C-alpha cells in the first residue's frame, strides 16, 4: 500500500499561481480486534502495521508483550488487524481511554491523565547510557537523513531508537504516538533491549510523548523541538533526560543533566 499519494495543487509563489503535483501523506484507518472483540481504530500510515499493533497493545497494557500474542493478521483491503491473544488485561482494555488524574511517583504533582498510564509507567533507573554533545549532533544528522517522507510531505512524524553510535530502528507515521508504537513493537519482536537506548523524535516533547518514552523504557529523548512544562516535570520525576532544540551546534538539556556531557 502506498504511503504517499500525489495530488494536483495550485501553488502561489513569486506573485503568481502555478499548477504542480504535490506529495501528500496517506491516511489509513486500522481497526484492531483482539480475540474477535473490536478494541480501537487507529488512523495511521499504512506501513509496519504489525509493529504498530504489537507496540500499541503492549504500551497500553492490553497485553504484556509478544509472548501474549499468538498471531496478528493484517487485512489491508478492509483495514482490519485481527489479533489472537492468550492473555488480555481486560481492565486496561476497558479503561484505556478513561481520564484519570493521580500523583506521580508518590508526589503531590498531578501528572497522569489516563488510568492505564498511571499503572504502566515506572521511575527510570539510572542506566549506563550517556551521550556527549558530539554524539547527539551526529545522531540527529543521521535521523534527518532517514526522514525522506517527512521532507517530501511535511505531514508525518518521525521517531527512532538509537544507541550512542547508530540508529537501530526508524519509523514514521501521521500519528506521533504511532511512530513510537511502531518502534516499540519492532524492538519487542526482535528482543532488542531499550534500557540502554535513546529515542529521537521529530516534534515537540509533550507529556504524552514523554509517557510513551517511559513506557518504552528509554532514559533519554532527543528532539529538534522543545518539551512542554508538564513533560519536563514528568521527566524529572521519572528520571528521564530530555534534550531539545538540537539544531546546528547547539542544544538545550531540560532534565537528567548527568546523562549528557
UniProtKB/Swiss-Prot annotation:
Alphabetical list of InterPro entries matching this protein: Cytidine_deaminase-like (IPR016193), FdhD (IPR003786)
Residue numbers binding Mo-bis(molybdopterin guanine dinucleotide):
245-250
Q: Which GO terms describe its cellular component?
A: cytoplasm
Task: Quote the subcellular location field of this record.
Answer: Cytoplasm
UniProt GO molecular function = sulfur carrier activity; sulfurtransferase activity
Active site (catalytic residues): 105
Pfam families to which the protein is assigned, alphabetical: FdhD-NarQ (PF02634)
Q: Which UniProt keywords apply?
A: Cytoplasm, Molybdenum cofactor biosynthesis
Q: Which GO terms describe its biological process?
A: Mo-molybdopterin cofactor biosynthetic process
- Which family would the database say this protein is a member of? Belongs to the FdhD family.
Matches recorded under NCBIfam families? fdhD_narQ (TIGR00129)
Q: Write down the PANTHER family for this protein, in alphabetical order.
A: FORMATE DEHYDROGENASE, SULFUR CARRIER PROTEIN FDHD
Known role = Required for formate dehydrogenase (FDH) activity. Acts as a sulfur carrier protein that transfers sulfur from IscS to the molybdenum cofactor prior to its insertion into FDH.
Record protein name field: Sulfur carrier protein FdhD
